Amino acid sequence: ALGVSPESAMVIATATSLATIVPTSVSSIRAHHSKGNVDFALLKAWAPFILVGVLAGSYLVTVLNATYLTLLFGVIATLSAINMLLGKKDAIFSSLPGRIGQWIMAACIGLFSSMVGIGGGTLTVPTLTFCNYPAHRAVGTAAAVGLIISLPAAITLLFAGTTPIDAPFATYGYVNLLGFICIVPLTVFFAPIGATIASKLDAAMLKKVFAVVLIITGLRMLAQVFL
């Protein structure tokens, strides 16, 4: 935005993105749950560790240079997408790791997602499908992970952050309320439509569709760094 420093713009964009994910995730969860594609047992086991990662990430995003993190995740997302598109059809691992391994995975998903302002899908879906987890349940469960990530992160950045002096109009904390109001109606409307389409695709096609979305996300992150 005109007159906003790159540092402030990055944090505000991250916080606003996380805030928009909250209502979008709720809409998506309801749609996926109606089709039986949300694994609540996995969510119950992962939620505390996702939350720990989110709280740490919400703090770190306000004190660290987000450019390098965005670059890292742009590379990771792009490579993961290419692997999903061109890699072998079988999962990399035969199943999810043990409890400690899953706790670490959950904490890392929460940490990194909250730091770059993304929902649960970008990291959760590849992580689960690489561990031979059913694609449809991975997508549905990732929607719920998105809520666990975005809600505490958005609250932290909304109320715990000091609004930058160069922030654009209608910014409270680090969240731009005008951007939130403009984006949310569309995301909430289209989330159930996306869930319905996803449920009708076979697993192989669903992975390819998600991989395309993921590579677009990765390239967008890289563009933020280099353009």
Predicted stretch roles:
Residues A15, A45, Y68-V75, I100, ...:
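Alpha-helical transmembrane segments of integral membrane proteins
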Residues A1-A45, F49-I50, W103-G110, G121-A195:
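Small-residue-rich hydrophobic segments that form or flank transmembrane alpha-helices
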